[in-house]
Amino acid sequence: AWLDSFLSTRFDDYLPTISNPATSPEGSSRLSAYLTSGVLSVRQVKHAITTARQSPPEGVDVAVFRKNVDAFASRVSWRCHFVQRLEMETSMNERSINPELDEALGRVDDEQRFLAWAEGRTGWPFFDACMRSLRATGWINFRMRAMMQSVAAYTLWLPWQRSGQHLAKLFI
């Protein structure tokens, strides 16, 4: 039902809305929890995408619709790629690709900075709002997920493993 509603009624503005935290809750597919838990398979999603691309809803700009379909199909493929990488390289979420660089950077596991980051109390309004939204709903769009991890690792200089584990626990 959620996939059908996405492809038939919420899909018109997919590309313009997916990056914006204010519009992405409606404009994104929000299928990640269904895919992760196995309620929905990638095969089902790909089939629905193919069907939608061949038979766009009446009254839509077909070129725009197909551009959105192709972009969504690409995201589903990238999701599969990264799931496969994590399954093949099981230490990827614990060990850096370049351990020498991690050692040279000397990140500090500062508890105060970590808690401020994790609770959305950094003092940066946009970041804090995104973190509080994730904590309340269990979902945030992909650009904001990347921003949250970047703030932890590159701005607050926290170990990326701990912040990554924390984010993973928050996602539905």
Regions found by a protein language model. Name each.
Residues 24-27, 46-47, 105-111, 144-147:
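Short acidic (Asp/Glu) and glycine-rich catalytic loops that position anionic groups and cofactors
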Residues 93, 99-105, 146-172:
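Active/binding-pocket-proximal capping segment
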Residues 29-32, 71, 112-115, 125-135, ...:
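Contiguous, well-ordered alpha-helical segments that form the cores/surfaces of helical PPI scaffolds
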Residues 66, 137, 141-146, 160:
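Alpha-helix N-cap/helix-initiation sites
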Residues 50, 54, 81, 87, ...:
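Hydrophobic alpha-helix feature that most strongly marks membrane-spanning transmembrane helices
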Residues 1-100:
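Glycine/tryptophan-enriched, flexible segments
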Residues 15-18, 60, 109-120, 125-139:
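Active-site-adjacent structural elements in folded domains
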